[in-house]
Structure formats: C-alpha cells, structure tokens
C-alpha cells in the first residue's frame, strides 16, 4: 500500500470548478466512505477548503486507485470525468507525502505561510477518523505533516509572508481603496464561523470604527459581536434577514457564510450608495460577481486573490529544508516498517528449521539425555541468532536509505519466504451510516 493524492487547487483549476467540488461535513463523510468502499483504496481523507480539494488515500494499485478517486469525485459532484482529469493533479508514494507536508506548512497556499491550513488538515483528519476511514498509514502521515507544519512556523519567518487568506484579502481591499487602514470605516460581517471571526479580528486591528455582524443564528452573531467589543471594537449583531437594511450605512462588507446561495447580489445594493468595498471569503461564492458592475462597488473574492497572488513566488528555503528533513525521517521510518514483516518471517523460518532439525536429532540419537539435548538446543539457537543478527540489522539500515532496491523482496526471494499481506486497516462493513447529502 502506498499513499496517493488526487486533487485540485487554485493553482490548477478555476474557482467555478472548485465550487462544484466543495464539500460540507456531511458530503465529505459520505465521500470518504465511498472511497474506501473501492477495492483499490484502503484508507481515505479529504481536505476541502476555499481554494483546495484533495483526496488522500492508501492504494494497492496506482492506476486503479486514481481512476477510483476520479469516479467517486464525479459521482459526488456531477462534473464530467474528462473535465475533472483536465484539472486534477496526482502525487504518489514519497511525492504524495512531501505534498501533504508542503500543504500543511503553508508552502502550497495562495498566501505562502498562512496558518489556517494546519487547522484545516487537522479537521479533515478528525472528520475521516470519526468516519472510520483513517488507519495507521494515514495517521502516521498526518501526524508527521502536522509536526512539519509546526516546525516550519516555529523555526522560520515564513509567517511574515502572509498570516492568512483574511489578511491577504484585507490588504488587497486596502490597496484598491488606496488606503493603509480602515480608520473611520464601518463594516458588515456576514457569518459567524472561523473565517468570519478572523475577519472581524483583522478588521479591528486595521482600525475599523464599527462592525455589524449578521448570521442565520442570531446567538452566534451576538457572540462574535461581544468578542469584538471585548477586543475594543464597537460592534452589534442583527438578524441575517436585516443585512440589506444596513448596506447603505457601511463602507466594507465581508461575507464568509459558505452558503449555497448568494448572500448579496447587485439588485440588493442601493443605487446611490457611493463607494463600497466587498470581500468574499467563501467557496462557493457568497457575493454575486455582478455587484462589481454597480458604480462605486469594488469586489475582492477568491478568484481575484488567486490572480493577484504570484504563483511563481519563491518558497522559503528554510521551510523547504525542514520539509526535506521531515520527509526523509518519515520515508526512512516507512521503509523500515515495510521490511519488518520480511525480517520477522525470516526469523520465524529460522526458528522453524531449528525445531525441525532438533526433532530429527532427537529421533536419530535417542540415547541423548535431557540436559545434553537442552544444551545442544540452546547452542543451535545462539548460533542462528548470531548469524541472523548482523544481516537483519543491516537490512533495516539499508532499507532506511532511499534507493531502488526492495530489500524486503530480496529477503523473500533469497530465503523463499511467504510474507503475509498487511491487513486492510478499514473495515467497510463497520463504517457509520451515510449522512443525508445537502
């Protein structure tokens, strides 16, 4: 079994296609269950963010595994298979492990160095674990990747490149406004989740005068407004249905609801409003593109941010060095684990031969007393253990090194061993019942 990544991101696909593949918790749970139901896939988890959709799986067959993932994504989204193949990228084995480490470190993000992705990978892992589709292989890779991400953010200055999508969006909005802060401005924040909370916090740091929070659950909107007040920013909460009533009173709108319908369209904006900056942090999009056609209205969304971000931005060398170190440690440990069953089989084979030969000796020399036989038995086992010790230690050391030699296969061929296949970690019959899709 080797790790496989099949995905698309802001680097490979248009936002409109990413929208079609975005998943809420229920869809993600159903999809990982569908993935491990395929014979070629043993474990699976899905990272779904505003600019990324990636399937991580353990597969016994590269080509079949890729095809199975694409078919499941097609069934989930309704997107044509050929269209999917045109935008999906694939990573396999060590390259897949390296990709997850780079993603978790923020090196593959639209804003290099952003930290939100660590939490998003952790959430994807917990979601798949609860769904019963994560086994020891993905568990080990995720833990190694999270450790790598923590090291990168702790030991390098990569955070200076960009704290998050929120800060990047606000910086782009300020650039369009020819301003350095939001002093004297009033804002409407739609949503009360993690992204909306980050937006409210960042607006406060940039000098916003007042924040109005609207959310479909009023209590959550009130909590976010209370947090803003505690942080020293004037804020209030309103019912979500009243969001249009305050449009004429604000200078900035930030929407992060992740709804399936637009929260604001051009028809909702008062004709004589004046300048209005709109920031859409959601995928699928919250704010209709047609708002940008209204005089005085400016729109910053995920697609705009992708165009602004430099896809050729140089990666932090210190961060890349850490990723390389952690990848080598992870892959070395993996190769040692891969050869362990063959080593264990060799020792069992040797023990079986000893038992067989001692039984023959006992039959051929029945006059040997029990003490002498026990001494012969101990001596033979010591000799065999000493003969096997150096080769088994050395084969693990050699296996830890990268290369094209399969030492576990070599041991099996040299000694005629039959190594049992590693059991599948995920039992499809024990998965939770499907969740109703949105």
Swiss-Prot record:
**Molecular function, one GO term:** NADP binding
Catalysis performed (reactions): (S)-4-amino-5-oxopentanoate + tRNA(Glu) + NADP(+) = L-glutamyl-tRNA(Glu) + NADPH + H(+)
Q: Where is this site: Important for activity?
A: 99
The pathway where this protein functions is: Porphyrin-containing compound metabolism; protoporphyrin-IX biosynthesis; 5-aminolevulinate from L-glutamyl-tRNA(Glu): step 1/2
Signal sequence range: none
- PANTHER family in the cross-refs: GLUTAMYL-TRNA REDUCTASE
Domain notes for this protein: Possesses an unusual extended V-shaped dimeric structure with each monomer consisting of three distinct domains arranged along a curved 'spinal' alpha-helix. The N-terminal catalytic domain specifically recognizes the glutamate moiety of the substrate. The second domain is the NADPH-binding domain, and the third C-terminal domain is responsible for dimerization.
Q: What does this protein do?
A: Catalyzes the NADPH-dependent reduction of glutamyl-tRNA(Glu) to glutamate 1-semialdehyde (GSA).
**NCBIfam families linked to this entry:** hemA, PRK00045.1-3
In the record, the note on similarity to other proteins reads: Belongs to the glutamyl-tRNA reductase family.
Protein name from the UniProt record: Glutamyl-tRNA reductase
Q: Which organism is it from?
A: Corynebacterium diphtheriae (strain ATCC 700971 / NCTC 13129 / Biotype gravis)
Q: Which gene encodes it?
A: hemA
